[in-house]
């Protein structure tokens, strides 16, 4: 039996504060709740899902590289710079080839050429997700460095956006 397709869900800066940070914009659902619902949905779709959250751009880039089978960079102390919640894989374990990435880059959406280049450099298809409607917010949030290269962009659906992204990745992307 073939192993299930593997999808990585990446959440960027401040998304660990979901549920308490500006609930009038982001709602009351926590990142843990979103990840648990995504795990349940992935299982029902026959997918393997790994989750990762970091407030640090370099750690996100390292995790994207790792997703394509490249070893993560090491900090000056020699420790791996990125962490992951999946069992049996993680920094320093070598190849971790994925079928797709679902990414909510948070504020890095509007600033990170590095994350864009990492996604493009790995060639792994990705879906960009935002809890809020970034186009209905401040002008500086209207530009995304990722959207023009994403297989799909989902914004303004609240936590359901993650479910829609997972459904799209699992059923409609050529993985």
UniProtKB/Swiss-Prot annotation:
It catalyses: 3-dehydroquinate = 3-dehydroshikimate + H2O. Substrate binds at residues 104, 110, 117, 131-132, 141. One of its GO terms (molecular function) is 3-dehydroquinate dehydratase activity. Pfam families: DHquinase_II (PF01220). Pathway: Aromatic compound metabolism; 3,4-dihydroxybenzoate biosynthesis; 3,4-dihydroxybenzoate from 3-dehydroquinate: step 1/2. The keyword Lyase applies. The record marks 21 as: Transition state stabilizer. The active site is at 26 (proton acceptor), 130 (proton donor). Keywords: Lyase, Quinate metabolism. InterPro entries: DHquinase_II, DHquinase_II_CS, DHquinase_II_sf. Its EC number is 4.2.1.10. One of its GO terms (biological process) is quinate catabolic process. CDD domains: DHQase_II. It is an enzyme of class 4 (lyase). Is involved in the catabolism of quinate. Allows the utilization of quinate as carbon source via the beta-ketoadipate pathway. HAMAP family: AroQ (MF_00169). Homododecamer. Adopts a ring-like structure, composed of an arrangement of two hexameric rings stacked on top of one another. Belongs to the type-II 3-dehydroquinase family. This is Catabolic 3-dehydroquinase.
